[in-house]
Amino acid sequence: MENKTILREWFERVDSEKTGNITATQLKSALAVGNLEFPLSVVQQMIRMYDSDRNGTMSFDEFVGLNKFLLKVQQVFSDLQRGRGYLVPDDVYEGLVKTGFSLDSPSFHTVCESFDRKKNGRIHLDDFISLCIFVQSARNLFNSFDTTKQGRVTLDFNQFVYFSANCRI
């Protein structure tokens, strides 16, 4: 959905309680209508990525940001899936590069394997979106610790646990 008017109408339908915010459960149900099935934990991570006021829900403006991200990731998937309906690891790597991520080989293979639910070397759209959400969340959190913008951070154990818990899916 690209048109803001259409997005607003969609958002208002999902916001059944008319609070101006949608919950993870409401967002999960709405995404399922569009054939995007995600575990609640992934939807909660989507909200955390764009929840600028940190209230645990998603306002319309926050939703617009998520929608833009999802459209970009879906387009990359569509461009690379070559009519198969899934990506192979080489496609996933290219897709990550096209979405602005750069991972070294060990990191890439670990992430790719962890999002290959069936362990068959095929990443479907929902898994690719989940993978991109994880990498984006990790990048956002890493950048918050990388105060000198050197591309390196030092974490004590408590910070590591905090980091890990915030990137969980």
Where are these regions (language model features)?
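EF-hand Ca2+-binding helix-loop-helix modules
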Residues: M1-M49, R54-E94, F101-V111, L125, ...
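Alpha-helical scaffolds that organize eukaryotic protein assemblies
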Residues: S114-R117, I129
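C-terminal interaction modules of eukaryotic adaptor/scaffold proteins
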Residues: R139-I169
